[in-house]
C-alpha cells in the first residue's frame, strides 16, 4: 500500500492532480467564494501554473489564487 503525504496547493508542481482534503484557515470570506466555485473537500484539482500565481483547474474551471490562499488548501495528490 502506498502512503502519500497531504500537501498544500502551493507546494504542488504544474501537472499534479489530486483531491482537496481540507481548507485549513479562516480565509475571511474567501472560503465561501471557493466553495461556490467548487473548491470543496473531495473536489478534484489539477495544478496548471505555480508562478507568478497559483492557477489550477477544478470542476472544468480555471482558478487563480494568491499564494496565502493556496497554502490554506490541502491536497492529497494522486
Regions found by a protein language model. Give the residues of each.
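Compact, glycine-rich, soluble single-domain proteins
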Residues: 1-78
Amino acid at each position: 500500500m502506498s502512503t502519500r503525504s497531504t500537501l498544500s496547493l502551493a507546494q504542488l508542481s504544474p501537472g499534479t492532480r489530486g483531491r482537496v482534503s481540507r481548507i485549513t484557515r479562516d480565509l475571511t470570506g474567501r472560503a465561501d467564494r471557493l466553495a461556490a466555485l467548487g473548491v470543496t473537500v473531495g473536489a478534484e484539482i489539477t495544478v496548471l501554473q505555480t508562478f507568478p500565481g497559483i492557477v489550477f483547474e477544478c470542476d472544468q474551471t480555471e482558478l487563480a489564487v494568491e499564494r496565502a490562499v493556496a497554502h490554506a488548501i490541502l491536497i492529497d495528490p494522486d
